[in-house]
Amino acid sequence: MDKIIDITNSSPKNYIRYFSDIFERGLTMSYGSGEVSMCSHMLQTAYFAEKDGATPELIVASLLHDIGHFGTDFSLDFSDGSHKYMLSATKDRLHEESGADLLENLFGLDVSEPVRLHVSAKRYLCTIDPKYYDKLAETTRHTFKLQGGNMSREEVQMFEAKHHAEAAAKLRRWDDLATHKERKIPNFEHYQILLEKLLKVEV
């Protein structure tokens, strides 16, 4: 397999190619219960966002919400069994922060901050609705514990006060629905024009 595109000191156009490359190669990397790939999961999340009439920024956030896993939880050799690695993890690697930091520079806060908050949104939803936890995939339950578990009352209030909290909660709900193997969804190219339009600098 060829080396993934190098984005060190890269142009915005190369970032789009980088994302496209990840979505193509990452189709072998399992997610959740192992029935879907990580990239299919992200595409499904974007599908739900678009279906529900989300803003363009939130659709892109949904599409790229787990991009921070690559290079943190998952190496870029794109080997299979990633969900098994997540089940055995003993430390939270803050993929939401890695992803959001990258996306903020490219697309701005309306894309980056729902991504940054989507882990907190899981904790929030499980706290305000205890039945929500029962809907989570096995790996998501495991990482929930690593990420802090249920929120305190103060944490709930702090989350609700954040500007992008509502968007993050919407993203999280789509995120947790996006685990079906047979669902027919658009591919990455379906979103490429939208990605290029939202870039903060010229492609």
Please give the residue ranges for each predicted region.
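Metal-dependent phosphohydrolase cores
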Residues: 1-203
